[in-house]
């Protein structure tokens, strides 16, 4: 629709006013992301207590298998998952799960455990 307005109005003042409106809209869009950040900072105290409970539960179910690599057992949407995943440190020093990894359901985990000896044999052959 804006294209039709540009075709109808041939005066330069109309296009100038459109560009001013665009600039103002861009400024508003840039300012908008800043507001949620400020709101999150004020509510961190209540969220911080909840996240500390989650992190203590997560720490109990995390088993280190390498540098920044862990096997963890967690509940996701009512389902138990076994994660084998790389982690990274954010700017606050909190560990966050990375993209590299896999989540197994208990059935897949049991199948993997049953095949451990075969996997070990294959590793020895190489």
Swiss-Prot record:
- Name where it's found: Nucleus
Asked if the keyword Ribosomal protein belongs to this entry, the reply reads no
Compositionally biased region (Low complexity): 7-16, 45-55
Q: What ranges does the record give for the region Interaction with ssDNA, renumbered to this chain? A: 76-100
Give the top-rank taxon of the lineage listed in the UniProt record for this protein.
Eukaryota
GO biological process annotations for this chain's record?
positive regulation of transcription initiation by RNA polymerase II
Coarsely, its chief localization is nucleus
The segment annotated Regulatory runs over 2-50
- By its UniProt entry, which InterPro entries does this protein fall under? PC4_C, ssDNA-bd_transcriptional_reg, Sub1/Tcp4-like
The family line of this record is: Belongs to the transcriptional coactivator PC4 family.
Question: What's this chain's function?
Answer: General coactivator that functions cooperatively with TAFs and mediates functional interactions between upstream activators and the general transcriptional machinery. May be involved in stabilizing the multiprotein transcription complex. Binds single-stranded DNA. Also binds, in vitro, non-specifically to double-stranded DNA (ds DNA).
The name under which this protein is listed is Activated RNA polymerase II transcriptional coactivator p15
The scientific name of the source species is Gallus gallus
Q: What is the lineage of its organism?
A: Eukaryota, Metazoa, Chordata, Craniata, Vertebrata
């Amino acid at each position: 629709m804006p294209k039709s307005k540009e075709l109808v109005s041939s005066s330069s003042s109309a296009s100038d006013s459109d560009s001013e409106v665009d600039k103002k809209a861009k400024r508003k869009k840039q300012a908008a992301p800043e507001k949620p950040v400020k709101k999150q900072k004020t509510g961190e105290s209540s969220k911080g207590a909840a996240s500390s409970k989650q992190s203590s539960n997560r720490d109990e179910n995390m088993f280190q298998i390498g540098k920044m690599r862990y096997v963890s057992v967690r509940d996701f949407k009512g389902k138990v998952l076994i994660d084998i995943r790389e982690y990274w440190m954010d700017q606050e020093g909190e560990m966050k799960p990375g993209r590299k990894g896999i989540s197994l359901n208990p059935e897949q985990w049991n199948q993997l455990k049953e095949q451990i000896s075969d996997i070990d044999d294959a590793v020895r052959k190489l």
